[in-house]
Amino acid sequence: MNSTRAITVFFLILVGLFGTLIVGPRKAMTQQDQAAQKKQQTPTIDEYQPKSMLVTKEHKIERAKFPFIDIHSHHWNPTAEEVDQLVKEMDTISLRVMVNLSGGTGERLKNTVAAMKGRYPDRFVVFANMSYDDLNTPGFGKRVAARLEEDVKNGAQGLKIFKDFGMELKYANGQRVHVDDPEFDAVFEKCAELKIPVLIHVAEPSAFFDPWDYHNERWQELKEFPSRARPPAKYPPFETLMTERNHLFARHPRTNFIAAHLGFHGNDLERLGKTLDSLPNMYVDIAAVLAELGRQPYSAHDFLVKYQDRVLMGKDIYEVNEYKWYFRALETRDEYFEYYRHRHAFWRIYGFQVPDEVLKKVYYKNALKLVPGIDAKAFPE
């Protein structure tokens, strides 16, 4: 009996040892495999694109409720075929008039006007631009003013100033051209005389001027486009540019200025409101800043209602299939939906539906008030 028990115990010990030899290494391999698999399946921040599980009402709006004017678009040297296609696409979304801000000056301006307004006189507006080729020659500002007057005679209906003005443009001695540089006073006074608006892009999102660290909410965009960072060693501070811009607007009260992209105050609508209160000749467009409005629907709604006479519809980079996000935000109360460009907003946005009268002003009435030569009969009363 004792012999049998001893044999049984010995057998169990052998089984245990053998099991350890077999199972132990296999368990270790499984842990390694799991770790490797987990590492492989962990997405980067660029790859992580979660789909919302929220179920709410969705409104698919393919065309605007009212015909609208896009005050902020860019088309460089368009061909006849491109313009024909553009009009076909505009018709599908109720885009009645498009403002091309990239008309250039001189012969290029003439060519752009001929290509767009020459073919479709009621569908396009072209803005002129400044050339800085003779910036360092005395009398520059007066010459630009004279060229602008000639451009208006040749079909320009406004002046667009790009973002290099104030940020990157420099004189031969290395001094930065300030936004409120007196050299350009003649240009802005000429705009008042000609009764044309100035659509001006000053600065960039304030986050681009902040430290590029993991607390910067535009970190992902800066990672994708490092050249968008505005480090202090190379660029003036954001607040300096805002001060110069406001000083410029105040110094030319007869000139109507449209600050592009909500003046880069879309993240602080209270500040923007106070700025508009202090500068009655200042207007703003909503081009490329829908994500800012869409993340604060209550504030956005109230802001648009209060400043309904000062805000204009604009898109910036033309893509016909992206306008529907603007329509959905402005015309519905839809909740928590994706923005069309992930790098601009890693957050979802909300509709901030405004009353029809406000919508009409944003879509076309304010532009009709500011831009000469647009046929108002093409729009509702």
Language model features by range: what are they?
Residues 9-20:
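Bacterial N-terminal signal peptides
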Residues 30-122:
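An N-terminally biased module of ancient metal coordination in phosphate/nucleic-acid-related enzymes
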Residues 37-40, 44-47, 65, 123, ...:
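Active-site gating loops and adjacent loop-to-helix segments of metal-dependent hydrolytic enzymes
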Residues 69-73, 97-100, 124-129, 159-161, ...:
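Hydrophobic faces of well-ordered beta-strands that scaffold small-molecule active sites
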Residues 75-83, 100-110, 133-142, 169, ...:
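Acidic-and-aromatic substrate-binding clefts and catalytic sites of carbohydrate-active enzymes
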